[in-house]
């Protein structure tokens, strides 16, 4: 995961090209950052990250800040907590699953006497100024925990600081904010690109042409993922990125862009690195052009992709990251915080499960079709074990216990 990120079945209505300038759909926040940190600065920053998690922090500066000991002077409110969700867009199934999971987790805490029973939800529909107003209102109205899918890395910072000063916990779900008063729980887009470059090079034996199928131009996810892939591929002289396209996380748009590219580029294409919801459209474009379907990699585990994968016997992989499991993953660190535990860093990056040919049948169901709108989450819905987050916290009391629920 890091956008409307909304990895989901989505985008027919959400991410049109006209909306590209204001909605950040699967990838989230617009890219805006300073120069790359020096090796010394990187080493200093990573020294605060648990050793076993540092491998997931490559290129961390593309996704946001990593601040050491950011909540040293912060104290949580006592239960029962009012849990709230501040969202930038609620127009697709990925976000719907996210909210459904948060509602289920809130009920579990309420049943234990630790929370009020209803999750308070706001939706700014892509308007960052409205989202900020909604955030400030949530703080004023007594929210104790605010989970959020922010529409900007910086646009909510005044509200997040206000929350921090009033003892309200703000947790950004897979769309990091730069303000140190918020806790980010996310996947690292640079790492996804790096992994993709290494995997593709291995499948092609170090020789072949690659197309990058991006989502929206200019978002942090877009820049980080493509940079991670390009820097990895550049280390192998037989590999070449021959195209960088933008499909707006929408299969039909991706198909159209690939068709246009193939019409003017007759050279063989060995692989397409797709960044969300576009794998089927990419493959169909090659078929329509009379070209062999290349290796296709993905970052969203749509059932439609697995059906197409099965039908065409693809060489492929996809990350697993539905909205419900992502919400649960972000909620666990929030519970650590509400138990008085202190996070070592402001941004917690986590790995994701990966579907390959080796474990394909653990996720595929015969009922899946190319028209399916579900996510292939498998039997174990956890993206990482709950214990993964233990290494990021010190002190405090044991956290409250909750269980992940299926929302897909």
Which residues make up each language-model segment?
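Short beta-strand elements at the ligand-binding edges of bilobed clamshell
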Residues: 123, 177-199, 212-216, 244, ...
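An alpha-beta-alpha
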Residues: 83-84, 91, 102-103, 194-244, ...
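Hydrophobic alpha-helical segments within soluble ligand-binding/sensing domains
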Residues: 49, 61-70, 131, 185-210, ...
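Short beta-strand elements in bilobed, periplasmic/extracellular small-molecule ligand-binding domains
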Residues: 109-124, 209-212, 233-251
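Flexible loop/hinge segments that line or gate small-molecule binding clefts
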Residues: 153-191, 209, 303-315
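Extracytoplasmic "Venus flytrap"
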Residues: 37-43, 54, 58-105, 109, ...
């Amino acid at each position: 995961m890091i956008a409307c990120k909304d990895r989901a079945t989505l985008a027919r209505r959400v991410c049109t090209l006209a909306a590209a300038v204001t909605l950040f759909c699967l990838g989230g926040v617009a890219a805006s950052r300073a120069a790359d940190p020096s090796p010394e600065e990187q080493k200093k920053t990573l020294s605060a990250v648990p050793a076993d998690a540092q491998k997931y922090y490559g290129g961390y500066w593309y996704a946001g800040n990593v601040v050491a000991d950011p909540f040293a002077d912060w104290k949580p409110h006592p239960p029962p907590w009012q849990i709230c969700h501040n969202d930038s867009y609620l127009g697709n199934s990925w976000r719907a699953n996210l909210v459904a999971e948060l509602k289920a987790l809130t009920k579990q805490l309420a049943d234990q006497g630790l929370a009020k029973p209803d999750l308070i939800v706001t939706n700014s529909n892509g308007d960052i100024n409205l989202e900020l107003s909604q955030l400030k209102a949530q703080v004023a109205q007594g929210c104790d925990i605010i989970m959020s899918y922010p529409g900007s890395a910086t646009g909510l910072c005044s509200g997040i600081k206000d929350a921090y000063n009033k003892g309200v916990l703000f947790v950004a779900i897979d769309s990091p904010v730069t303000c140190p008063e918020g806790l980010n729980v996310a996947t690292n887009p640079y790492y996804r690109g790096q992994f993709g470059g290494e995997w593709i090079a291995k499948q092609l034996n170090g020789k072949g042409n690659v197309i990058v199928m991006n989502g929206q131009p200019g978002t942090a996810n877009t820049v980080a993922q493509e940079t991670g892939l390009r820097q990895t591929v550049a280390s192998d002289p037989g590999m070449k990125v021959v195209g960088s396209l933008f499909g707006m996380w929408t299969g039909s748009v991706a198909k159209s862009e690939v068709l246009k590219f193939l019409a003017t580029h007759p050279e063989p294409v060995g692989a397409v690195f797709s960044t969300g919801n576009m794998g089927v459209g990419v493959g169909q474009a090659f078929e329509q052009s009379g070209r062999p379907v290349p290796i296709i990699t993905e970052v969203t585990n749509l059932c439609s992709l697995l059906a197409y994968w099965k039908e065409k016997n693809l060489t492929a992989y996809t990350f697993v990251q539905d909205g419900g499991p992502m919400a649960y993953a972000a909620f666990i660190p929030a519970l650590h915080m509400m138990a008085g535990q202190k996070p070592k860093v402001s941004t917690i990056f986590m790995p994701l499960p990966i579907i390959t040919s080796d474990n394909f049948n653990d996720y595929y169901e015969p009922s899946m079709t190319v028209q399916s709108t579900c996510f292939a989450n498998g039997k174990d819905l956890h993206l990482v074990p709950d214990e993964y987050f233990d290494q990021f916290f010190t002190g405090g009391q044991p956290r409250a216990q909750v269980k992940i629920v299926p929302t897909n």
